């Protein structure tokens, strides 16, 4: 799949989104910063990537997801948990960065911060009904299928 990428900050030419391995599902996104940013515990900040994408095809969307190592080791996750990039969005990719950890965290310029995953999208149409055909599960939720 070819994807239109617009470089909004010339410094990002050296830090384009890339797959870390041949089996990677996510492209690494980097922090487009002029200087280090310190996030105190509980603090959230919006970090620019210096890049914009245009998927164009409504059959696709992009998800911005946290990097597992940053979340597990440092408590750095996304403030909005998942960023959804619609196919018609053309603005800069921004990363809502939240320090849910107990220690301050310093984010350095061009550090890998999040990952971008391209996913297929199905736009559903609703069929209004009065009742559903009975399923085995029915209305059971939140633990209704058991713990183990």
Curated annotation (Swiss-Prot):
The keyword Metal-binding applies. It is an enzyme of class 3 (hydrolase). Pathway: Pyrimidine metabolism; dUMP biosynthesis; dUMP from dCTP (dUTP route): step 2/2. Substrate binds at residues 67-69, 80, 84-86, 94. One of its GO terms (biological process) is dUTP catabolic process. Transmembrane segments: none annotated. Its cofactor is Mg(2+). Pfam families: dUTPase (PF00692). It catalyses: dUTP + H2O = dUMP + diphosphate + H(+). The keyword Membrane does not apply. Keywords: Hydrolase, Magnesium, Metal-binding, Nucleotide metabolism. InterPro entries: dUTPase (IPR008181), dUTPase-like (IPR029054), dUTPase-like_sf (IPR036157), dUTPase_trimeric (IPR033704). SUPFAM superfamilies: dUTPase-like. It comes from the Bacteria. Its EC number is 3.6.1.23. One of its GO terms (molecular function) is dUTP diphosphatase activity. This enzyme is involved in nucleotide metabolism: it produces dUMP, the immediate precursor of thymidine nucleotides and it decreases the intracellular concentration of dUTP so that uracil cannot be incorporated into DNA. Belongs to the dUTPase family. This is Deoxyuridine 5'-triphosphate nucleotidohydrolase. It comes from Burkholderia vietnamiensis (strain G4 / LMG 22486) (Burkholderia cepacia (strain R1808)). The gene is dut.
């Amino acid at each position: 799949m070819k994807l239109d990428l617009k470089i909004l900050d010339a410094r990002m030419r050296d830090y384009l989104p890339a797959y870390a391995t041949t089996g990677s599902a996510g492209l690494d996104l980097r922090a487009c910063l002029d200087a280090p940013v310190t996030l105190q515990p509980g603090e959230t900040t919006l970090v620019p990537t210096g890049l914009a994408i245009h998927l164009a095809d409504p059959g696709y969307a992009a998800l911005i997801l946290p990097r597992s190592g940053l979340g597990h080791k440092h408590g750095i996750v996304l403030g909005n948990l998942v960023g959804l990039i619609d196919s018609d969005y053309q603005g800069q990719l921004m990363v809502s960065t939240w320090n849910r950890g107990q220690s301050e965290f310093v984010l350095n310029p061009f550090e890998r911060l999040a990952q971008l995953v391209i996913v297929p999208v199905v736009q559903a149409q609703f069929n209004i009904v009065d009742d559903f055909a009975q399923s085995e599960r029915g209305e059971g939720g939140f633990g209704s299928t058991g713990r183990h």
